[in-house]
Each structure stands twice: as structure tokens, then as C-alpha cells.
Amino acid sequence: MNSCLNELQAMQLRRLLETGLPLAARPYQRLAEQIGSVEEHVLQQIQRWQEEGLFRRVGLVLKHRALGFRANAMLVMDIPDAQVDEIGRRLGQAAGVNLCYQRPRRLPQWPYNLFCMVHGREREQVCQLIERLLADNGLSEVPHQLLFSTRAFKQCGGRFAPPLREVVNG
């Protein structure tokens, strides 16, 4: 698929995507207007980048603390390797789980291989949700820990583009 955007427009689009999609009924049309193009060309370029492996998906970075969700915890579990994919899929679809992913264990210090992020307004709410999640999935006896956030770090989307001046100055 050939790009209908020129090199400068493509780089501008990458920069705009790093800051997030506009809150608009047609966010890709809004992006197109900002770079002097049309929505169809923006969508074609994004599809091309996805096919090339520049990124796997377009997702949402939720600033949960700004919305009042201050009790944020990571549930870490030691799931048998033969079950981790299936359990991870189930937990990733569960109400209240914002993110679920597998990582390698770092034995002997870190025996956990499945991670679930949960946000809540109050700590007790998160604890209850985790207890129910573990019980409903037969995981209450699985080695696990619930790690609450103590501070927030900067949240941002992916970074894909070099500084714009490198493209302009060539």
C-alpha cells in the first residue's frame, strides 16, 4: 500500500499520534485537517504503519487519577506456565481489570509471571474486587501479591517519530 501522505505529513501525523487522538466525533479527520490532508489518507498511513510493525494497536491512555481513581494496584501471580495464556485471557476480560499481561519470572527473587492492573476510588474497593476475581477464577490459592501504587509517574503513549526538525532539515 503506497502512502498518500508526503514525508513531512507522515512525520507530522506520527507526532500528533504521540500526543493522543483528538476528542472528536471524527478524530482521524481532525488529524488530517491538521496536516493538510484528508481522513482517508491518514487512515491508509496508519494501516501501513501497522502492517510494517511500527505499532500493534491504537489504544487509550487513561489518566485515572484525574478521574478520582486513586487506589491503583497491580495483582501479581505465579500461574503455571501451561495455564497462563488461558487464565490471562479470562482475567483480561474481567470487569475491573484494566490491563493483564504476562512477563518472565525472575527467580528466585520474583516468582510472578502474570500481572493485572486494577484501579479503584478506594483501597477497600480494589481489595474486594481482587478477592472476588481470584475466587471466581479458582485462583485464591495461587501465590500472589497485591501491590498498591504509592506515587504516579508520567503516563504517555508510544513515541514513534524523530524530532520534526530532522525531517524538515533533512
From Swiss-Prot:
InterPro entries cross-referenced by the UniProt entry: AsnC_trans_reg2, HTH-Siroheme_Decarb, NirdL-like_HTH
Enzyme kind, highest EC tier: lyase
Keyword tags: Lyase
Deleted gene: phenotype: Insertional mutagenesis results in the loss of respiratory nitrite reductase activity in vivo and in vitro. Mutant strains synthesize a periplasmic cytochrome cd1 that lacks heme d1.
Name of one Pfam family that matches: AsnC_trans_reg2
GO molecular function: lyase activity
Summary of the function given for this chain in its UniProt record: Involved in heme d1 biosynthesis. Catalyzes the decarboxylation of siroheme into didecarboxysiroheme.
Subunit and partners: Probably forms a complex composed of NirD, NirL, NirG and NirH. All proteins are required for the total conversion of siroheme to didecarboxysiroheme.
The protein, known as: Siroheme decarboxylase NirL subunit
Organism listed in the record: Stutzerimonas stutzeri
